[in-house]
């Protein structure tokens, strides 16, 4: 089979070629003449855990449904394992979908739910027996094979839904917010199980979610979507540490954003004066905007900001303010500091189990030039 390939690096840094299991090329999908998916380009590599992350209504679920075949592409190309999927129905695509609602058959027990697809394909009885047994073992549900969905917990139902998807041995497993219906503790447990399952099977997983922590913890790469378009594709670390747009910076985790323009350009740093009069110095990297008077947004993560009662000597990015809120979070403490220009910033620091400062305490907030990031100001920011 003639599959497209992509260059990647293994842990030793040696470049290798990996086939692409899913390719979207300038894909559009319209509803009532409005684009739900707007010129999307993305590649999913064989064996990759790829997440599409974004807020409600951003087009991520529609994109997944296009890959599954539940919706048809209006413009552009969609390929799975190098083959065009135009007019190919869902049952003929080498994919299986796990839905948030699980979509189990209530009148069938666990075994029959998992076996349903194989029986529909008229697989041999011996093959059905061995593959269902294997799938239930993978998700640790062998002992509950005779139970009905109504007799299972949410986590157990999720495992059955996963087994039903895996039993057909698809090239690509599609996950539609698979953990969204679970409580926080169970969701974290299932994240670990899902990650282990992916590593053990080596299959390609494509997941859509609005949960940033879920995407960051599970994914090899993430595509961040907004208003039908891809804002950025990268590893979890790239997405969090080096966001390309202010939307990505603000959506992934928490951040403090300062709008301003570049007033000084030097080889190793730029200086920005914000709209509220602060002067911020940012260390340069290959993505740093480099044009005088260029409108930019400065992003500073709360955990990168330090607090002190006295001003550090000879330090850029040090601003006087006062505490207006202190929130105890157990292992961490979240501080809200109002700077002298009236802007409120969030600061997250480890809990050192000392006495917490009182509200209205005068304080200095500061951060290193390398701990903030300048991003091009977009017209819709």
Curated annotation (Swiss-Prot):
Stored InterPro entries: AAA+_ATPase, ABC_SmlMolc_Importer, ABC_transporter-like_ATP-bd, ABC_transporter-like_CS, Mo/tungstate-bd_C_term_dom, P-loop_NTPase, PotA-like, PotA_ATP-bd
Keyword field contains Cell membrane: yes
Major localisation: membrane
An MF annotation (GO) of this entry: ATP binding
Reaction(s) catalysed by this chain's protein: ATP + H2O + polyamine-[polyamine-binding protein]Side 1 = ADP + phosphate + polyamineSide 2 + [polyamine-binding protein]Side 1
Disulfide topology: none
E.C. number: 7.6.2.11
Domain ABC transporter: 22-252
Gene3D superfamilies noted in UniProt: 2.40.50.100, P-loop containing nucleotide triphosphate hydrolases
Pfam families in the record: ABC_tran, TOBE_2
UniProt KW keywords: ATP-binding, Cell inner membrane, Cell membrane, Membrane, Nucleotide-binding, Translocase, Transport
UniProt superkingdom: Bacteria
Binding site for ATP: 54-61
Compartments where found: Cell inner membrane
GO CC annotations on file: ATP-binding cassette (ABC) transporter complex
Membrane topology: Peripheral membrane protein
Subunit architecture: The complex is composed of two ATP-binding proteins (PotA), two transmembrane proteins (PotB and PotC) and a solute-binding protein (PotD).
Function: Part of the ABC transporter complex PotABCD involved in spermidine/putrescine import. Responsible for energy coupling to the transport system.
Family statement drawn from the similarity comment of this UniProt entry: Belongs to the ABC transporter superfamily. Spermidine/putrescine importer (TC 3.A.1.11.1) family.
Annotated protein name in UniProt: Spermidine/putrescine import ATP-binding protein PotA
Protein species of origin: Nostoc sp. (strain PCC 7120 / SAG 25.82 / UTEX 2576)
Record gene name: potA
